[in-house]
Each structure stands twice: as structure tokens, then as C-alpha cells.
Amino acid sequence: MKPSSSNSRSKGHAKARRKTREELDQEARDRKRQKKRRGHAPGSRAAGGNTSSGSKGQNAPKDPRIGSKTPIPLGVTEKVTKQHKPKSEKPMLSPQAELELLETDERLDALLERLEAGETLSAEEQSWVDAKLDRIDELMQKLGLSYDDDEEEEEDEKQEDMMRLLRGN
């Protein structure tokens, strides 16, 4: 005999009670009343709307009717158009001025001193030094200048050539 199983089945599957016509009418009226109330409350635009955004440091709510205090010109004025200045490129220096700048460059001098002392430079520093020295060579060739060391070597070579010629004859 299983009285518990028959009781549990009846409790679990209880029929839902049907609503009467009056209850259904009352629910319909309530739904209609709720539908009429949808939308914003009357006067919400002037009442302050966003109280959370602007009133952190102020106690009094700000009146939304008060606008900006910046003056607005009432007359017709000509519109000033700004002309965009093109970015000026580095001014072209004369070869002489550029050569002087490169010869007095402190960074280049410091790196050359480090090289003479036997230190090894990083790849970036070495490439920078090489580029600057190449530019100095180009400028000196444009100006027709040469290193003092080169002049002495050329003179030595000329003297050696002359000595060879004299000995050979």
C-alpha cells in the first residue's frame, strides 16, 4: 500500500483555478491604467532631470534655464580664417656653416674620444659617428678642403716619387 505516492501526485499536479470574468476585467483595467502612465513625468524637463551628474560639489541644484555666460556677438562680423603655416623645414645651411656645426658637435667629440681611448661603441652610436664623419668628408670635398694629415701624406708621397725617379736615372 502506497498512500504517500498517491498524495504526492495529487499535490504536484493541482489544477490552476480559473479566474472569474470580474477578476479578468479588473486586471484588464489595471493594465490599461499602467499603460496610460508610461512616459516621462510631467514637468521633468524643468524640474532638474539629471541630479547625479552635475551636483557632486554643489548643494543647490543648477537651474537648467541658465545657459552659457560667454558673450555672443549680435552683429555680422567677418569670419577670420586662419592660414595654416606649412611646417618649416630645417633651413639649408651653407656647407661652411654646416661643417662648422659638425666640427663643434660635443656628442661627436665625446664619442671620438671614447674611440681613441679604445672603448667600443654600441652599434647605434657607431653608425651615428660614421654618418657624421661621412657628412664631414662630403662637405670638405664640396669646399675643396682636405685634412692636414692628408696633405702631409701627399707631400711625403711626392717626395718619395721624386727620389725614386732620381735614383732610377
From Swiss-Prot:
Q: Does the keyword NAD apply?
A: no
Pfam families assigned to the protein according to its UniProt record, in alphabetical order: YihI (PF04220)
Compositional bias (Basic and acidic residues) spans?
20-30, 160-169
Keywords on record: GTPase activation, Ribosome biogenesis
Q: Which GO terms describe its molecular function?
A: GTPase activator activity
Basic residues: bias regions:
10-19, 31-40
**Region span, Disordered:** 1-100, 144-169
Bias (Acidic residues) occurs at 147-159
This protein's source sits in the domain of life called Bacteria
- Which InterPro entries does the record associate with it? YihI
Q: Which GO terms describe its biological process?
A: ribosome biogenesis
Positions of disulphide bridges: none
- Compositionally biased spans, kind Polar residues: 49-58
State the similarity comment. Belongs to the YihI family.
Its subunit composition reads: Interacts with Der.
The record describes the protein's role as: A GTPase-activating protein (GAP) that modifies Der/EngA GTPase function. May play a role in ribosome biogenesis.
Write down what this protein is called: Der GTPase-activating protein YihI
